[in-house]
């Protein structure tokens, strides 16, 4: 993979991060201002991730048949059209459908670029390359919440800016030469996507726990935290600063953690960062002032902001090359399940319990993922065992 090729993939994922980082807080603020309930706000945020889940079972076969580039082109076009749709279609449930379409398009883009990077990276450089990939997404995601103040000028303005930037980045896709994922000589015509999903889950299930936890954390913070912060008396402008603090912390440590994972192992690094993140959110729950919360978000971002990319790297270490497309899809599926559960559970928690503390809820989630990694023992694979398990 050439540097220019890698740069285009990194650019695409950074713009995707920007649109996602903008959507969650902007729509949450618009709905809270319009008097929508926390439960509706949380449920609405699941639209993007429901789109991911709906599309996931049908992604692997087109990728193997068409290659990486066509899926990126189609995914990017769906995202761009949907972003501009927010400008013209003013309805809570139409916006939910637009979020769902963005989920489908974003997943096509992420799945293709992510599988392209993992399949082209050596084991020695995998952590570094995926950390750069994650860093680019984090940079975009960190920039997204800065669109929140534009809502004061016009509710449509954040969507216009995001749509135009996404269109510009999408045009670079046409400089890429198409390629196809690796296949195995042991595969037969009877092997299908669902069988490969089963094999990937059998040998790499423990690596999907961090991606689930990160999905829960990301949407709980970006979907439920703005509502929780407003109820604490924290201003919208302060929320626009606190939220990017997590992503900025993630950006700072994304690359060093990738290097450390190449040296000391993905599992060991994941155990340390998950425990650190849980402690940070516990402290934020005990001392809920804007300055303490901002500091805890920053430090937690330095730790758990790399959980998703380290989970992908760990999955790539555990699975054979021909199962990487299925493994990458399962990373996206588990991330989406966590992302759906995050805002729904967070919204329900805040609406049901009068003195609910969102940060304790997040602490419990991260601690549960840490415990799963401690107790989980991945199953080693061999070509003979892999195919006998599917027969």
From Swiss-Prot:
<dbReference type="GO" id="GO:0022857">
    <property type="term" value="F:transmembrane transporter activity"/>
</dbReference>
<feature type="transmembrane region" description="Helical">
    <location>
        <begin position="156"/>
        <end position="176"/>
    </location>
</feature>
<feature type="transmembrane region" description="Helical">
    <location>
        <begin position="66"/>
        <end position="88"/>
    </location>
</feature>
<feature type="transmembrane region" description="Helical">
    <location>
        <begin position="269"/>
        <end position="289"/>
    </location>
</feature>
<feature type="transmembrane region" description="Helical">
    <location>
        <begin position="239"/>
        <end position="259"/>
    </location>
</feature>
<dbReference type="Pfam" id="PF07690">
    <property type="entry name" value="MFS_1"/>
</dbReference>
<keyword id="KW-1133">Transmembrane helix</keyword>
<dbReference type="InterPro" id="IPR020846">
    <property type="entry name" value="MFS_dom"/>
</dbReference>
<dbReference type="GO" id="GO:0005886">
    <property type="term" value="C:plasma membrane"/>
</dbReference>
<feature type="transmembrane region" description="Helical">
    <location>
        <begin position="92"/>
        <end position="111"/>
    </location>
</feature>
<feature type="transmembrane region" description="Helical">
    <location>
        <begin position="7"/>
        <end position="27"/>
    </location>
</feature>
<feature type="transmembrane region" description="Helical">
    <location>
        <begin position="329"/>
        <end position="349"/>
    </location>
</feature>
<feature type="transmembrane region" description="Helical">
    <location>
        <begin position="39"/>
        <end position="59"/>
    </location>
</feature>
<keyword id="KW-0813">Transport</keyword>
<dbReference type="InterPro" id="IPR011701">
    <property type="entry name" value="MFS"/>
</dbReference>
<keyword id="KW-1003">Cell membrane</keyword>
<feature type="transmembrane region" description="Helical">
    <location>
        <begin position="356"/>
        <end position="376"/>
    </location>
</feature>
<dbReference type="InterPro" id="IPR036259">
    <property type="entry name" value="MFS_trans_sf"/>
</dbReference>
<comment type="similarity">
    <text>Belongs to the major facilitator superfamily.</text>
</comment>
<protein>
    <recommendedName>
        <fullName>Uncharacterized MFS-type transporter YfkF</fullName>
    </recommendedName>
</protein>
<dbReference type="InterPro" id="IPR047200">
    <property type="entry name" value="MFS_YcaD-like"/>
</dbReference>
<keyword id="KW-0472">Membrane</keyword>
<feature type="transmembrane region" description="Helical">
    <location>
        <begin position="197"/>
        <end position="217"/>
    </location>
</feature>
<feature type="transmembrane region" description="Helical">
    <location>
        <begin position="131"/>
        <end position="151"/>
    </location>
</feature>
<feature type="transmembrane region" description="Helical">
    <location>
        <begin position="292"/>
        <end position="312"/>
    </location>
</feature>
<keyword id="KW-0812">Transmembrane</keyword>
């Amino acid at each position: 993979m050439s540097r220019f090729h890698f740069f285009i993939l990194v650019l695409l994922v950074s713009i995707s991060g920007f649109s996602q980082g903008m959507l969650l807080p902007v729509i949450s603020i618009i709905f809270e201002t319009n008097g929508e309930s926390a439960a509706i706000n949380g449920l609405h945020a699941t639209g993007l991730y429901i789109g991911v889940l709906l599309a996931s079972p049908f992604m692997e076969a087109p990728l193997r048949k068409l290659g990486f580039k066509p899926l990126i082109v189609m995914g990017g076009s769906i995202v761009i059209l949907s972003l501009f749709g927010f400008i013209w279609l003013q309805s809570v449930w139409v916006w939910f459908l637009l979020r769902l379409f963005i989920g489908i398009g974003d997943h096509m883009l992420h799945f293709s670029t992510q599988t392209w990077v993992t399949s082209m990276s050596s084991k020695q450089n995998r952590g570094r390359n995926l950390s750069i990939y994650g860093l680019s997404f984090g940079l975009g995601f960190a920039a997204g919440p800065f669109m929140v103040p534009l809502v004061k000028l016009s509710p449509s303005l954040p969507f216009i800016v995001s749509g135009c930037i996404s269109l510009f980045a999408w045009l670079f896709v046409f400089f890429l030469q198409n390629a196809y994922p690796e296949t195995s000589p042991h595969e037969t015509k009877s092997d299908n996507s669902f069988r490969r999903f089963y094999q990937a889950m059998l040998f790499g299930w423990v690596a999907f726990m961090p991606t689930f936890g990160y999905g829960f954390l990301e949407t709980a913070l970006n979907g439920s935290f703005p509502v929780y912060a407003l109820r604490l008396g924290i201003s919208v402008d302060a929320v626009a600063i606190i939220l990017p603090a997590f992503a900025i912390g993630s950006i700072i440590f994304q690359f060093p953690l990738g290097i450390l994972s190449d040296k000391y192992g993905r599992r060991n690094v994941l155990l340390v960062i998950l425990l650190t993140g849980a402690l940070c959110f516990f402290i934020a729950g005990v001392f809920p002032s804007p300055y303490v919360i901002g500091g805890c978000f920053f430090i937690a971002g330095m730790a758990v902001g790399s959980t998703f990319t380290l989970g992908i790297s760990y999955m790539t270490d555990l699975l054979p090359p021909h199962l990487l497309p299925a493994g990458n899809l399962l990373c996206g599926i588990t991330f989406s399940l966590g992302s759906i559960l995050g805002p729904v559970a967070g919204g329900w928690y805040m609406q049901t319990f009068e003195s609910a503390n969102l940060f304790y809820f997040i602490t419990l989630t991260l601690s549960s993922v840490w415990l799963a990694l401690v107790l989980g023992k991945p199953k080693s694979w061999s070509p003979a065992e892999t195919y006998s398990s599917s027969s």
